[in-house]
């Protein structure tokens, strides 16, 4: 991940106030060492100055997680606006319990079921009025080729 990678992701991202970076925790040290180009000594990453507030990269909040691919893989960092994500609740949360199977051990089994799915409401990037620039509310960094 380089400064150029991040600025190109911003270039192709549908700019909104709700955009956040979601990055692999294995990348956490990389932006901390990056600075703006041309001798500007300020880091592109800023730690939160307040408890409960996220760190930022290039002014956008960043969430560090192990739920995305490891550093060097496609999707290890992405810029997302989750307001462009639909959630489909297929079944309300249901609870059930039984002691039939483990009755002799004086135990009860519990089951909770919630059927839910989600997906972006835009399947492809869209072209801006200039006829060439494409943007999307979901932009990921591709895999490294080195």
Whereabouts are the PLM-identified features?
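Structured, hydrophobic secondary-structure cores that serve as assembly/anchoring elements
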Residues: 1-146
